[in-house]
Amino acid sequence: MTERLQKIIARAGICSRRAAEELLREGRVSVNGQTAQLGDSADMECDTIAVDGRSLAARPPVEVYVMLNKPRGYVTTMSDELGRKTAAELVADCGARVLPVGRLDKESEGLLLFTYDGALIQKLIHPKGEVDKVYRVTVRGALDGAAERLSALRDVEGEPTRAAQVKELRRGEKDALLQVVIHEGKNRQIRRMCRQCGLEVLRLQRVAEHTLTLGDLKVGQWRYLTAQEVQALKEGEKA
């Protein structure tokens, strides 16, 4: 598949896409022995691409782990045939090929992990993985006893589900802020739970997953995980 050179270089882990554009401007990239220009494309399957004379194929793959604070309005896919904004666009400059670990629906926001570490992805999304996911959910509707009703659910719209841990953090005149901890990754699970309990979700934000917490990472921004955070994810212990 033919792609822009800066995208190929970034995915190979050499540098960010913007830095790759600078390499092209400086004449440090070649394709099949010929100096490449910014705007050129190539096919990794057919062409020999080199940076500073060293073939990309000869470089070991770089494994990165990225935490994104996904904004509302972005779908959790690598590309979208409907032309919608994707979360992958926001981490395109991370310097390596990555995939989202699990999903957040378009109108949800918060912590979303990206990596190309297949073993870790499988661990975190496997139904038997017992991975806790913590959400802050603003709701309105039948507020009295809402936390208790949600905690008591054992099926969601006819589908068996594990018990969630729910507590009320704040109550306003017309809405309430709940903390919801679930242990599964079923499609739109919390929204379906709330609907079943007579609640409308106004905002849904994932603030923690497994050993990771969102912290003060700004909406739309991403950061690399630290070595300690990666180790904790793999071992299942707090960093």
What residues fall within each predicted segment?
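Basic, flexible Lys/Arg- and Gly-enriched helix-loop patches that mediate nucleic-acid binding at interfaces
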Residues: T2-A239
